[in-house]
């Protein structure tokens, strides 16, 4: 059964301006350790690809926080939620710490879809209760 649905759209131009002002500190606030590795790799190759990656992760975390109904409040935090790609390329939500414990205790499962174009990144998250 559906527990919650969340969606978010991020203006990559605004994110680029924030990154220009705050630099790496902004990425370190939003991204978890594995996401930071991917971000740095993509940014070094093509800056636009790195910023698009950061925008899709920002958007997906916002959408996830809406789907679980907490917004960006405890137990949700930027770094406790990572959006990582499976070998197939499918994005997956991986949770850590108190957020992971809370999510598991609720018996929830999440699905995420991300997309980006030149100026925008968007995400859609569906959280469902696991059948018992």
From Swiss-Prot:
One of its GO terms (biological process) is fatty acid biosynthetic process. GO terms for cellular component: cytoplasm. GO terms for molecular function: holo-[acyl-carrier-protein] synthase activity; magnesium ion binding. It catalyses: apo-[ACP] + CoA = holo-[ACP] + adenosine 3',5'-bisphosphate + H(+). Its EC number is 2.7.8.7. It is found in: Cytoplasm. Mg(2+) binds at residues 8, 62. Keywords: Cytoplasm, Fatty acid biosynthesis, Fatty acid metabolism, Lipid biosynthesis, Lipid metabolism, Magnesium, Metal-binding, Transferase. It comes from the Bacteria. It is an enzyme of class 2 (transferase). Coiled coil: none annotated. Its cofactor is Mg(2+). InterPro entries: 4-PPantetheinyl_Trfase_dom, 4-PPantetheinyl_Trfase_dom_sf, ACPS, Ppantetheine-prot_Trfase_dom. Belongs to the P-Pant transferase superfamily. AcpS family. Transfers the 4'-phosphopantetheine moiety from coenzyme A to a Ser of acyl-carrier-protein. NCBIfam families: acpS (TIGR00516), pantethn_trn (TIGR00556). This is Holo-[acyl-carrier-protein] synthase. It comes from Methylibium petroleiphilum (strain ATCC BAA-1232 / LMG 22953 / PM1). The lineage of its organism: Bacteria, Pseudomonadati, Pseudomonadota, Betaproteobacteria, Burkholderiales. The gene is acpS.
């Amino acid at each position: 059964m559906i527990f919650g649905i969340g969606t978010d759209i991020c203006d990559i131009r605004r994110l680029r301006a924030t990154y220009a002002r705050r630099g790496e500190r902004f990425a370190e606030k939003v991204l978890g350790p594995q996401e930071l590795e991917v971000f740095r790799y993509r940014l070094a190759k093509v800056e636009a690809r790195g910023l698009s990656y950061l925008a899709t992760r920002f958007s997906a975390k916002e959408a996830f926080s809406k789907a679980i109904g907490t917004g960006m409040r405890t137990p949700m935090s930027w770094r406790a939620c990572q959006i990582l790609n499976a070998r197939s390329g499918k994005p997956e939500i991986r949770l850590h710490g108190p957020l992971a414990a809370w999510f598991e205790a609720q018996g929830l499962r999440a699905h995420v879809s991300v997309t980006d174009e030149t100026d925008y990144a968007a995400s859609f998250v569906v959280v469902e209760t696991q059948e018992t």
